[in-house]
From Swiss-Prot:
Family: Belongs to the OMP decarboxylase family. Type 1 subfamily.
Gene of this entry: pyrF
UniProt keyword list: Decarboxylase, Lyase, Pyrimidine biosynthesis
PANTHER family associated with the record: OROTIDINE 5'-PHOSPHATE DECARBOXYLASE (PTHR32119:SF2)
Originating organism: Helicobacter pylori (strain ATCC 700392 / 26695) (Campylobacter pylori)
This protein's record includes keyword Ribonucleoprotein: no
Pathway entry: Pyrimidine metabolism; UMP biosynthesis via de novo pathway; UMP from orotate: step 2/2
Name of the featured protein: Orotidine 5'-phosphate decarboxylase
Family annotation (Gene3D superfamilies): Aldolase class I
Chain positions recorded as substrate binding sites: 8, 30, 59-68, 118, 178, 187, 207-208
CDD domains registered for this protein in UniProt: OMP_decarboxylase_like
Subunit structure: Homodimer.
Length: 227
């Protein structure tokens, strides 16, 4: 299991300062919409300057028509990133077009499809998708696998079921990781790192428990022990 550190702080300088504290550790730097829109592609180069071994996870959750998604993913791949997220709800035609475009490259990032955001409650998911969350997450994940993507973004609570249905080689990335399960904030389906490993998660995403800590490096070291 590998650790992705979410870089969601208010200022670019704060994100870079956090990474300076984590220099030398085996982790992924997760760049989401806020940081990428604000700081641009140059931010990725600044991450590499701190530690060239940091792997870069661009969490943009692409969702559009097939032509637009394929072109956007290609431009993201040109940034030499290691992982990119897309929405499974964009459907098989879009995912297939995207993978055909990326597979023509000598090197491409891992493509992870978002099944159900961890902010969804069961009731909210049912309202949007008119299906039980776990059932639909597996169905969307199966479509993603058929399209050729590498894995899915899901909660810890769907990870094991997806692995059992689609095979252990199909990757799962699980956000909503907390040190204390009572600390939900804006997430609904949260778990800790040990539970993520028990449910065969390949990647975990941790943000606030790290960057809100007095000693972020110590928190990361503890998390890495559980990985």
């Amino acid at each position: 299991m590998q650790l992705c550190v979410a870089l969601d702080l208010e200022k670019k300088e704060d994100n870079l300062s956090l990474l300076q504290e984590l220099k030398g550790l085996d982790l992924w730097a997760k760049v989401g919409l806020r940081s990428f829109i604000r700081d641009g592609a140059v931010f990725l180069d600044e991450i590499r300057k701190i530690d060239e071994n940091f792997k870069i996870f661009l969490d943009l959750k692409l969702y559009d028509i097939p032509y637009t998604m394929a072109n956007a993913a290609l431009e993201c791949a040109k940034l030499d990133i290691d992982m990119l997220t897309v929405h499974l709800s964009s459907a098989k035609s879009a995912l297939t077009a995207l993978m055909q475009r990326l597979n023509a490259l000598k090197k491409r990032p891992l493509i992870m499809g978002v099944s159900a955001l961890t902010s969804f409650s069961e009731e909210e998911f049912l309202m949007v998708y008119n299906a039980p969350l776990k059932t639909q997450a597996i169905k969307l994940s199966a479509m993603g696998k058929e399209s050729g993507i590498d894995g899915v973004v899901c909660s810890v609570f769907e990870s094991l079921a997806i692995k059992e249905a689609l095979g252990k080689d199909f990757l799962t990335l699980t956000p909503g990781i907390r040190l204390d399960q009572n600390d939900k904030e804006d997430q609904e389906r949260v778990a800790n790192a040990k539970e993520a490993k028990q449910n065969l998660s390949d990647f975990i995403v941790v943000g606030r428990p790290i960057y809100q800590a007095k000693e972020p490096r110590e928190v990361v070291l503890e998390l890495l022990k559980d990985c």
